[in-house]
Amino acid sequence: MFTQLITALSYRVFLSIFLSMRINTLTNMADPQLTKLIQDLTAIRSFAQRYSKIIRDARDYVIDAGKTGRTKLSEAEKAEKTIFGMKVEAYLRYEFAWGKGPKLDFYFNCIEFDSKATVGKTWMVPPEAVGELCLLTLLDEKRSVYSAGVIRASLTALTKGKNQDKKRSVSAIGKQSIHWLIKDELY
């Protein structure tokens, strides 16, 4: 009985990993623009180290420990957490000399893409970014790590429901299709 349970759990874990890999592979093969963006971003010199500094700087800007006494971003107000995402976007654009796209946050090597950052568990995608490429940043303060990945924000990668701003969140299936450029890196 116990062996069957372990086998069933192992099979589920294997299947989950396999499907995630297949989704990423199929998505990348069918989306040359996504593939090119992944290649271009991973080719940037010291990308992860520079990204880490951006995360620290944006976090420190919002926390403003000397004037607020805070030590964690989780202690900030909701509006201030939004500023974290705005600072990540601005610092990325400056650090990597990316242009501003006509519709989205960035324009780099002939590809336009949006920036989404979260200190929670998911990202909110506005209507103008649906169907577009997004650079996702995830901050995990409890473990002092961050992750950054790229996704095509297709309707299948997003939840059906929308908030009052008509933003959708990345769905469970969408999270499986994220191509992680940086995973659980210390900031």
Predicted regions and their residues:
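Nucleic-acid endonuclease domains
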Residues: 2-108, 117-187
